[in-house]
Amino acid sequence: KTKKQTGYLAHLWAKLILKFSNISYSIKGLDKVLNDKQYVIISNHQSAIDILVTFASIPNPIAFFTKKELFLIPIFGWAMKAAGMISVNRSNKNKSKSSVDEALLKINNTKLSILNYPEGTRTQFDALKEFKKGGFILAIKSNYPILPLTILYKKDMINNEIRLVVDNSIDTLNYKMSDRDILIDKVRSTIQSNLN
């Protein structure tokens, strides 16, 4: 319950920061997001602003994978932990696997949706990198649907709003672990088509 409440506070906090920063954004397809449903949200990643516009646009409480180093920052790190964010050690494959296991517990025991940037790092504009498997393994193991999210920036960001596009959620009930590459290709193609 606390993490759900913290998630809603993060939603309001993100909206306020964007408003006071004079950053405009719009979202298409919000009607495809059910308020009482949990998702594994798979998104492209282009800017540090991505997290803010996602939290501000999607009303559901969200946790996300983030670098373990950020948890060491005083106050900020504590706040992220309280909100249910998930630490990732990218230099250690076993630790990365434990992050997926932690996310699985979180999505099963809370009302949080999980946000995942499968590229693993920021990519400029319309060039998608290869997708890592962690978020898709989580979706298949948990049987929660994947919600593809595309964030669109113009190369000249001055006075241009950021656009978010939500596509239809993808049911993962019929996907086995051996099908994860098929699922990855499906989601990646959806996001790439919005970027083109």
For each predicted feature, which ranges?
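A broad, low-specificity signal marking well-ordered, structured residues that form hydrophobic/aromatic
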Residues: 25, 62, 164
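Non-catalytic C-terminal accessory region of glycerolipid acyltransferases
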Residues: 97-196
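Short glycine-/small-residue-rich flexible loop motifs, especially phosphate/cofactor-binding loops
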Residues: 14-15, 77, 104, 136
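Catalytic core of membrane glycerolipid acyltransferases/transacylases, capturing the structured
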Residues: 1-12, 19-21, 35-93
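A generic structural signal for well-ordered alpha-helical segments
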Residues: 17-18, 80, 107, 139
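Glycine-rich helix-loop-beta junction characteristic of Rossmann-like nucleotide cofactor-binding loops
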Residues: 29-34
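Short gly/ser/thr-rich secondary-structure transition/capping motifs
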Residues: 20-28, 97-98
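Thr-Gly-centered strand-to-loop micro-motif
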Residues: 28, 65-67, 89-90, 118, ...
